[in-house]
Amino acid sequence: HLTNRRQRQMCIRDSIYSIEDLAQLIHDLHQVHPKAKVSVKLVSEIGIGTIAAGVSKANADVIQISGHDGGTGASPLSSIKHAGLPWELGLAEVHKSLLDNNLRDRVLLRTDGGLKTGWDVVIAALLGAEEYGFGSVAMIAEGCVMARVCHKNTCPVGVATQKEELRKRFKGLPDNVVNFFIYIAEEIRQILSTIGVKTMEELIGNKEFLTTKNISLPKTENIDLTSLVNNEISYKDRSWIKHSNNAHSNGTVLEDSILTDAQFINALTTHGEFSKKIEIKNTDRSVCAKISGELAQ
């Protein structure tokens, strides 16, 4: 049992209040596992472009834009119905903001939140996404019925439960999910052939294929989609689409001299002891995090 004071302390310690806090967390993660890419998930909202620019400068490797339509059965109903904006709006704003600030080549853009078809993937690519996340629909393909009791251990179809009698009800097969994604890929291939494009790479961030439908409906007559299809600003330089396969580096850090020390390496491989005195300055960040990562591996 935790007291209210203890709960508040834990909440404060685990929260991110600024880009600086996030940058420090990303730095910590890169220290612990230098080869691992760090992904930051942002909910689609007005002003997300400015936030994404800060996240990119904070050395994130991937920025994930999540739309309002997403949410698995474990998500609160209020989050599924009332949180965030469509991923299309957030993705378009982030892509443009990163291009305007010469940051687009530093991060991969990923989007999710209600993606269901190959058409959704193509639209996401045209708006700037390079990776695409499927959650709920992939779970449904293997048998999920969205009962929204994942956290109660009472899943009626045995997807999210540890109870043996319920797990016996699970009829899903890996092939079901594989077939779903095969048809997604086939739909994408058909769309590419229709518009005369050979590869997905040609689509990414290329708005010349986007236009609005000339359909007049009362509920959409006041919606302005100019920001999504406006191609007046031409970004002819597409060098940003080539990303490094390696995670961002923190550069030379204090622990590097220790990690290359022969005595340390011997102690690490033989589970022996190692002792060394070093001077730590206030500019040294995440001290010993890299060593902890090496020990964990």
Model-based region annotation:
Residues 220-297:
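Charge-rich, low-hydrophobicity low-complexity segments
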Residues 13-17, 42, 46, 171, ...:
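Generic amphipathic alpha-helical segments used as scaffolds and interaction surfaces in large
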Residues 1-8, 12:
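Single conserved hydrophobic/aromatic residue that forms the stacking wall/gate
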